[in-house]
Amino acid sequence: MFQNSMKQRMTWEEFHGPNLGYVLELYDQYVKDPESLDADLKEMFDELGAPPGDIRAASQKNEEADFTAGSIQKIASAVKLAEDIRTYGHLNASVNPLRKTQEKQELFPLAEYGLTEQDVKKIPASVICKDAPKEVTNGLEAIQYLRNTYKKSISFEFDHVHIFEERNWLMKKIESGELFTPKSKEKLVEVLRRLTEVESLEQFLHKTFVGQKRFSIEGLDALVPMLDDIIAKSVSAGTTNVNIGMAHRGRLNVLAHVLGKPYEIIFSEFQHAPNKDLVPSEGSTGINYGWTGDVKYHLGANRQIQDEHTKTARIALANNPSHLEFIDPIVEGSTRAAQETRTESGYPVQDVKKSMAILIHGDAAFPGEGIVAETLNLSQLKGYQVGGAIHIIANNMIGFTTESNESRSTKYASDLAKGFEIPIVHVNADDPEACLSAVQLAVEYRMTFNKDFLIDLIGYRRFGHNEMDEPSATQPMLYDAVRKHPTVKNIFAEKLIHKGIVDKETVGKIKDAVQKRLEEAYRKVPAKKEDMTHEIVLPEPVSNGFPDVDTSVDFETLRKINQELVSWPENFNVFDKLKRILERRAKAFEDDRKVDWSLAEAMAFASILKDGTPLRLTGQDSERGTFAHRNLVLHDSKTGDEFIALHHLADTKASFAVHNSPLSEGSVLGFEYGYNVSSPETMVIWEAQFGDFANAAQVYFDQFISAGRAKWGQKSGLVVLLPHGYEGQGPEHSSGRTERFLQLAAENNWTVANLTSAAQYFHILRRQAKMLLREEIRPLIIMTPKSLLRNPNTVSEVQELSNSSFKPVYEMSGLSHQYDKVTRLVLSSGKVSIDISDHFNKMEGEKDWLHIARVEELYPFPAKHIKAIFSKLPNLEEIVWVQEEPQNMGAWNYIEPYLREVAPKDVKVRYIGRRRRSSPAEGDPTVHKKEQERIVSDSLTRKN
C-alpha cells in the first residue's frame, strides 16, 4: 500500500524547505547504503528516484535543516495514512440510509500510524493532499479534510484503477472540492419538485390500484433526478442519443418522468382499459406495443427532448423482459449503432459523443448474473466499445427475500466492476445532492476517458418485491426500520426548509400541483375494459410472408466483384497456402465457372455492399472463419499488416465491419441484436463458433429475437449462422439445436434454413438484405455447413448466382422423370441430404421408385412447394423424413404435422433417423459412422 502511495502520489516537488534538505541527506545515505535506512524510507526512495538538479540546488538555501530520521518516518507514515483514507475511507462512509452514523467505528486514528497531532501539523498540507483548498494549511488539517471528504454520504473506490492519469484525475476532482460545490436554490427546488412527482405517482398508484404489481421505486427515488442530470449534462455536451436499460424496479416512474409517458396511459394499463385515444400515434413519446403485447413494467418508450440551448436528443428506454441484466449488451449494441456512420466503404466511422448508454442494475443481479461480466468485458474491445457506459446499481440491499449476505460473496454489490478497472462511487439515496455529485463525476469521467463508470445508489425497498408481497414475514427487523424511516422527499424538504430555501407552504403547493395533475389524468381513463373476444390478427404483410424479390446478380458484375475480392496491394505478402486458395478463386470465372461456399458468401457480401447496404459480421474467429474458409481479413506474413478486400470495392457507399468476438455467446449476440434493432438498414450477422454453443445465449433467442416483435412491435433482421452437421465430432460439435428454433417458430417470427449449396446461401443472404427495411422483415437463422464447405456437391455454377433465386425446396438433379413410377418421396434437410445424394448416385439397379428433395427453408413451412412435388407423383405411397439428429431433436417433431396435413390421402408419413436420445450425438466416431450409414441406407432401401 505504501509503495502504491509513493508511486502514485509523491514527487520531489512536494518536499519544501527544511523537509527537502533533510530528505536529500537521507537520499544520499540511501545511494551509499540502501539497507541502512528504514524499510519504508528505502521503499519511498525506490519510487522517487534521483532528485532533479534544480531541486538539489534549491536545497542549498536550507542547510539549517536539523530534522531527524524519525521526522522523515513521520512524513512517510502521514502519507500512508492519507493513502489509506483514500483507499478505505468508503468503509467509514454514511452511505446506508437505514444505518445510523454513530454505529460505525472510527477508522484511521493517528496513533495507529505512530503519529500525534503535533507530528502531522509540522508537515505541509501539500505533502498530504496537494489538491486541498487553500484554507487547509497544514498536514493535520489535510488529514481531517481527507477524512471528511471520503466518509460523507458519498464515498469512492478507485484504487483498482491502474492508469495514473485516471487515478490522478479522480483524486483531483474529489479532493479539490469541485464535486461538492453547493447547488443553486433553483436547482434544489427543481430536485424537490422532481422527488415530489416521483413519490406522489407511487403513492397514487398504491392507493388507486390496490394490490397491483408496479415494482415501486420508493427508497431509491433519487434515481429519477440522477437520470435527469445525466441526460441534461450529456445532451449539453453534444450527445444526441441516450439509451437506457433497466429492469422492472422503478420502471414505471422512469417511463413517466424521464421518458414522458403520460400518466393517463400508465393508469389505463392498470385499469386494464386501454384507450386508443390516449396513445399518441405521433409526437414526442412513442409507446411500443406488439401483437400479444407485454406487461406494463416491461414496455419501453422513446422521446425527443430539447434543452434550454435548443439542442435536441432522442431518449430511449429499451423494452425488457424479466430476465434481469440481459438487456445490458442490447443497450450497448444500440448505442454503438447510433455512434457509427455507415455511408462509406471501410469500417464505420464512430463518434462516441453522439450516443451514450445508461445501464441500471439490481444489487442482487449485478454480481449474480454472468451476463453482467460478459457485458463489462466488451467495454474496451474494438468491435464493441461505446466510449463508456454509465452504470447505476439501484441498490435496495435485498433481492426479493434474499439478503446480500446470501446473494453475493463480496462486500459491495459493485465489486465485480473492480476487475474491469471501473471507478465506483457509493452514494446514499437519501442525499439527493450527493447523488447529483456522483452523477457529475460519472459524466465528466466518461467524457474525459471514454470509459465505464459505476454509481452504487444505496437505498432501500419500501414495500415487498412487488406490492402483493409482505416483506415483514422474512425481514421483520429490516421492515420495522423501513416503516419508521421518512421518505427522501420529506427528508429533503425538511433540509431545504431548515436552510431557508423553501417554506412549508411552498412544499405543500408543489405537492398539491402534482396531485392535481395525477387526478386529472386519472379522470381521462375509461372505467372498465371492453370485452375483447377477437383473436389477435397479424399485420397483413407479416402473415403473407416474403414477397418475391430478385436476388440475382449479372455475370459481368460478379466477375468484377471476384477480381476485387482476390486482389491485394503489390507489396502485401499473403500467406503462401492462403495465396494458392485465393488464386484458385480468381479462376472461378475463367475455367469451370464453379463457386464454392466461401466465395459465394464473399460475393454476396460484396454485392450487398455495392447495393448500398452496410454489413456487420461478428463472432468467435469470424474474420478467418472457424473452419479456415472465410479469410476476409488478410495478414501480411512479414509485417502483420491487415488488408480487407471488402473495404476496397469500387463505387461502394456502405461500410463493412468484421470483428472477432470475445469468447462469449450471450453478450455478443445481445449486442448484435441491439445494433440491428437500432440500425435496421444494416445487415447484422452473428456467427457461432459451432452451432452447439448458441444455447449459451438462449435467453436472447427465447425472449428477444423470436418474440420481440410480438411483445413490443420490435422488428429485427438479424442473421444468425450456426455451423451444424453430424460428422463424428461428438455431442458438443454436431448440433445447432434446430429443434429449439423450430419449436419457437410461429407468426412468421423468423426464418429457419438448413442449406446445401453455395447458390442457396448467396440468394438467401441477398434476399435478407433486400427485406431489411420492409414490414415483412424477420430474423434469419441458418444452419451452416462444416465439412460441406469443401464438399464438391455444395459447389454451384456461376449461372445459379446470376440467373436464379432462392429455392425453399430443392429437388435433387439427375433423377428419372418417370414420375408415375415413384412410390417413395425422400425429404431431408442439410448435410444428410448430401449423404443421401452421394449414396443414391453410387446405387446400382432400378431407382425410379425414388424421388428426393431437400427442404432448405424449414420455417416458414414451404407447403406450396412440397404440394407441387406431390402433384407430379400420382402413385406416391409414402413420404419419409430423414434426419441425422435423434427423433426428439432436429426437424421431425416440427415438420411431421405439417407433412401429414399436406400429404395426399392414404400416403404414409414415416421417420428415418436416430432413435430418441438425451444426447445429440455419439462420442465414438466409429459408432457415428455406422449409424450414419444405416440412416442413409434405410432412406434409399425399398421395404419388403
From Swiss-Prot:
SMART domains: Transket_pyr. InterPro entries: 2oxoglutarate_DH_E1, 2oxoglutarate_DH_E1_bac, DH_E1, KGD_C_sf, ODO-1/KGD_C, THDP-binding, Transketolase-like_Pyr-bd. Residues 914-944 are annotated as: Disordered. One of its GO terms (cellular component) is cytosol. It catalyses: N(6)-[(R)-lipoyl]-L-lysyl-[protein] + 2-oxoglutarate + H(+) = N(6)-[(R)-S(8)-succinyldihydrolipoyl]-L-lysyl-[protein] + CO2. The keyword Phosphoprotein does not apply. GO terms for biological process: glycolytic process; tricarboxylic acid cycle. It holds the Pfam family E1_dh. One of its GO terms (molecular function) is oxoglutarate dehydrogenase (succinyl-transferring) activity. It comes from the Bacteria. Its EC number is 1.2.4.2. Its cofactor is thiamine diphosphate. Keywords: Glycolysis, Oxidoreductase, Thiamine pyrophosphate. CDD domains: TPP_E1_OGDC_like (cd02016). Residues 925-936 have a biased composition (Basic and acidic residues). Belongs to the alpha-ketoglutarate dehydrogenase family. E1 component of the 2-oxoglutarate dehydrogenase (OGDH) complex which catalyzes the decarboxylation of 2-oxoglutarate, the first step in the conversion of 2-oxoglutarate to succinyl-CoA and CO(2). Homodimer. Part of the 2-oxoglutarate dehydrogenase (OGDH) complex composed of E1 (2-oxoglutarate dehydrogenase), E2 (dihydrolipoamide succinyltransferase) and E3 (dihydrolipoamide dehydrogenase); the complex contains multiple copies of the three enzymatic components (E1, E2 and E3). This is 2-oxoglutarate dehydrogenase E1 component.
